[in-house]
Amino acid sequence: VTHVANALGTVNPVREIIALSHAYGVPVLVDAAQSTPHIPIDVQSLDADFVVFSGHKVFGPTGIGALYGKKHLLEAMPPWQGGGHMIEDVTFAKTVYKGAPEKFEAGTPDIAGAVGLGAALDYLESVGLPAISAYEHDLLEYAQSGLADIKGLRLIGTAREKASVMSFVIEGQQNEAVAHHLDRH
């Protein structure tokens, strides 16, 4: 389930969705790509089974991300590929894999990507998610008040629980033309 919708900024009620899913025995993966760099996430309080995010969404490198998973679920999952560091012991008769997370880390890891991701997370932590969230909220209010007088402008994504994302359409204008104009200016 998506924590925060990228196009509208809607903050989905993941805590309630997780509780309902768990009531039926369904594990839940939370896509936190849009929420991780903007709002604090307590995976244990949410009772999320898995949480994922992309490195580039937290101002880090592309091609790397993170997966949180409950230990018992990760231990129950088989490795999906083979390679050096993930193997505890190998004989002609059998292969014994290391425990999680090592059993999912075949071959040479993306060391440069991991260092870059760590630096990006350190930066976010140094600025502070509350400060980032407050600044983004101020920018959203400023933009909305500045655009309020544009004839035919209609905001999209006005959920009560919402991140600082502003989507809109302008009556009589092609969306791509508006986006192209804004991109140039």
Regions found by a protein language model. Give the residues of each.
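Pyridoxal 5′-phosphate
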Residues: 1-185
